[in-house]
């Protein structure tokens, strides 16, 4: 080892001796600057001076890396102290002929915190609940000048000095609706303005708070209680009092079938509407679910829907088209658990089948046989109907009501001859006079003398034919005058006869009363006898 290696211990020894046994002389050691504040890892120039002109020894004692700057003279030295990581008190010392002395400079290191961190917030926070904010700060100096601030946006919630390592500051916030979407953060303030420097701030990463309100009441679910296979139903789920309603998630499902609702939002409510289709695979009792999820909470409503299969009843005719007089069997069959009624069947215990026997008549043509089936599903009565029509083939018919046998019309008047033939199939009708002259049935004609006569109306179809004679009488104007004269004479004679009768009757009554008065016989009042 080099002989000079133990020499650094000498100044330290001199410093110690000078401090313990200061010399009797007037020599003094001074240091400049006496106080310094500098950033961590920084450098500073320290000047050590002594009052004697020829000091035996002049230097600085410090664990810091140092570099002496050469200056003229023997009583002053300048040192560059570098990489200052923490507070330090370098000491200048001198040894003069008249004594030893020392002087200290105070180095204060400042640095901003290495970590400023706000504890993560819950993803959702219910309105009306307390939220605890927690900020941790590691490092930073000088601690006497370091403050921790909790913020909502730019609003201060709490301010405390940084104490401990790591320093921790907490506060509690009562969550409100208007806190939704607010940013919370933590900030440190290293205030060195009194030392002639500036205010150093460090801010944590912000966290955005999401608040919510989910009422304790379950959602309202409106749906059919029963649903038929291969049909569609509508499901509506709604809930009021939500915040923020746009963040609410709605899940609708029938059994394992997820529904796709259309959601309509109000100020603090929503309504979700969905169509549901069911098949034979869904038959039975299924669970309908409406779940509303908001934040980290949910509300759910369950209902049961009964899926059923109920085909319309089957109406069976022996033949849909029969001839008159044919025996016809009408059957009605439905679901095994259904109860059916068939019109025309007398009252009887209801079951899944009903039957009717009849002999086809013309009146049965076009007759509808209606079968009504009723099935009870989950306490509800479901009704289905089916109708079949019977066609009866029968021969033509011509009767007085629809084809009068005698028409009397004034000459030159407008008339429409009407004659309706009935039958199935509808027969062809022709009315001919003398086998050649047709009567224009259903057409408006001017009545002439040629129209007068007897016509043979023939109705013909595949089921046979029928004939009927009709007579057309045409009245000429001269016959009308005769008729009017006869009628007028009859009216006059009738009036004269009635007048003569009334006159003779009054005369006889007067004569009778006169005779009675002459005999002195009182006349009995013509009063009604009193009943016993």
From Swiss-Prot:
The chain crosses the membrane at residues 481-503. Belongs to the immunoglobulin superfamily. ICAM family. It comes from the Eukaryota. The keyword Transmembrane helix applies. Residues 1-27 form the signal peptide. One of its GO terms (biological process) is cell adhesion. Glycans are attached at residues 130, 145, 183, 202, 267, 296, 385, 406. Pfam families: ICAM1_3_5_D2 (PF21146), ICAM_N (PF03921), Ig_2 (PF13895). Residues 504-532 are cytoplasmic. PANTHER family: INTERCELLULAR ADHESION MOLECULE (PTHR13771), INTERCELLULAR ADHESION MOLECULE 1 (PTHR13771:SF18). It is a single-pass type I membrane protein. GO terms for molecular function: integrin binding; signaling receptor activity; transmembrane signaling receptor activity; virus receptor activity. CDD domains: IgC2_2_ICAM-1_like (cd05755), IgI_N_ICAM-1 (cd20996). Residues 41-103, 128-193, 230-297, 325-378, 412-464 form the Ig-like C2-type domain. It is found in: Membrane. Homodimer. Interacts with MUC1 and promotes cell aggregation in epithelial cells. Interacts with ARHGEF26/SGEF. Interacts (on T cell side) with CD81, CD247 and CD9 at immunological synapses between antigen-presenting cells and T cells. Induction: Up-regulated by coagulation factor Xa (F10) in atrial tissues. Up-regulated in atrial tissues by rapid pacing resembling atrial fibrillation. The gene is ICAM1. Its main location: membrane. Residues 28-480 are extracellular. InterPro entries: ICAM, ICAM1_3_5_D2, ICAM_N, ICAM_VCAM, ICAM_VCAM_N, Ig-like_dom_sf, Ig-like_fold, Ig_sub. GO terms for cellular component: cell surface; collagen-containing extracellular matrix; external side of plasma membrane; extracellular exosome; extracellular space; focal adhesion; immunological synapse; membrane. A motif (Cell attachment site) lies at residues 152-154. Disulfide bonds join 48-92, 52-96, 135-186, 237-290, 332-371, 403-419, 431-457. This is Intercellular adhesion molecule 1. The keyword Ubl conjugation applies.
